[in-house]
Amino acid sequence: MGSDHHHRKLHVMFFPFMAYGHMIPTLDMAKLFSSRGAKSTILTTSLNSKILQKPIDTFKNLNPGLEIDIQIFNFPCVELGLPEGCENVDFFTSNNNDDKNEMIVKFFFSTRFFKDQLEKLLGTTRPDCLIADMFFPWATEAAGKFNVPRLVFHGTGYFSLCAGYCIGVHKPQKRVASSSEPFVIPELPGNIVITEEQIIDGDGESDMGKFMTEVRESEVKSSGVVLNSFYELEHDYADFYKSCVQKRAWHIGPLSVYNRGFEEKAERGKKANIDEAECLKWLDSKKPNSVIYVSFGSVAFFKNEQLFEIAAGLEASGTSFIWVVRKTKDDREEWLPEGFEERVKGKGMIIRGWAPQVLILDHQATGGFVTHCGWNSLLEGVAAGLPMVTWPVGAEQFYNEKLVTQVLRTGVSVGASKHMKVMMGDFISREKVDKAVREVLAGEAAEERRRRAKKLAAMAKAAVEEGGSSFNDLNSFMEEFSS
């Protein structure tokens, strides 16, 4: 009986929050587990399943015999007080309505509707474990009813979790004279300096504050945490996290590195708004390390005045660039200086919508990355060996910036100083954009940063190879939940 059990495939269920920044790494994770012999099931809604199906089909064609599938849950948006077709945070970030923030909070709470469906599925399927997004705190209780271990997937790294923990425990922001006065985060290794304006609002009385308390409590009761990170990137913080915050944690990243082929890299997320081959051909015509790639992820939003400053700053820097803007051609182009595209023709490329990010970052012509410091983007930049210009907007991005600029020392801050609840960026002048872009690409300090970044990229690749830290952590996770 015992030996039969070991021949049975480990069955892992994955339940990502419905946002690209959560679904893409979860898809990578499900592919990784099935490539190591597990059966992976991703739980999502009908509209979101369409985003995942094509990359899953590609993966299955490349790896016949591996098991990965999708289980669809019902999400009646209108009944839940949400607009029709609103099954992904992208719905709000693509349509900048006045009540966007209110609706996003409603969206978070509406996901509780999945609880009964999840319990029904767990009762009939009994997987070996459930890796559910941090934003589904009720999943711990649902899984517990059927003795299914629930793991939390955070979608961020050790550093930001430790920083948030230390600030939550010690509340150093209460002891400074003003919200812009810098302070050192107590207990956190590395003497990390931050301001109150840059930390996540800890208002425990707001709806979102209460929700985040629930998130933390459900993590304490869970069977542990799975992280998209690797030990060498943030070893001090991995050790701190496991000794002070959550004893059971496994790092299995960087997940983007497992996508080896052109097709797999091109199919992460939405269909790109540019032909991938055309984009790579443009990069092929540029010198190594000469192009700056500018992208602020799928959620951050900038007003036209800010986009205008970015355009002017890029033009002033004289650097070749690829700039991803969440705009369509139909938008009146008031956010661009007059004649801008004509003047930068051949030197700059604007992609409106979605870009094949990993393909661009991995290209030898790309020499730097202007990023909002979302964890997925940051890790993709690390894996590509790129120095970064950090421009955090909201969520845990200011913590991630500190990791890049103060710990890894592979980045230059553009000077964003305020955490924005609505993910609308702090205003930065063209002069600051120009200065940061030049600083990250040229000069002696830039070469030092590039050397450090290349070293980290080599460590990232080694971590996922046989015998690497993430390879071994995945092994120990699979052994733990198979027994």
From Swiss-Prot:
One of its GO terms (biological process) is response to other organism. Its EC number is 2.4.1.-, 2.4.1.237. Pathway: Secondary metabolite biosynthesis; flavonoid biosynthesis. Induction: Not induced by salicylic acid. Expressed in roots and flowers. Keywords: Flavonoid biosynthesis, Glycosyltransferase, Transferase. It catalyses: a 7-O-hydroxy-flavonol + UDP-alpha-D-glucose = a flavonol 7-O-beta-D-glucoside + UDP + H(+). An anthocyanidin binds at residues 22, 395. GO terms for molecular function: flavonol 3-O-glucosyltransferase activity; flavonol 7-O-beta-glucosyltransferase activity; quercetin 7-O-glucosyltransferase activity; UDP-glucosyltransferase activity. It is an enzyme of class 2 (transferase). Disulfide bonds: none annotated. The active site is at 22 (proton acceptor), 133 (charge relay). InterPro entries: UDP_glucos_trans (IPR002213), UDP_glycos_trans_CS (IPR035595). Pfam families: UDPGT. UDP-alpha-D-glucose binds at residues 355, 357, 372, 375-377, 380, 396-397. Belongs to the UDP-glycosyltransferase family. Catalyzes the glycosylation of flavonoids from UDP-glucose. Uses a wide range of flavonoid substrates including flavonols (quercetin, kaempferol, isorhamnetin, 3-OH 7,2',4'-MeO-flavone), flavones (luteolin, apigenin), flavanones (naringenin, hesperetin), flavanonols (taxifolin), isoflavones (genistein, daidzein), flavonol glycosides (quercitrin, isoquercitrin, rutin), and chalcones (isoliquiritigenin). This is UDP-glucosyl transferase 73B2. The gene is UGT73B2.
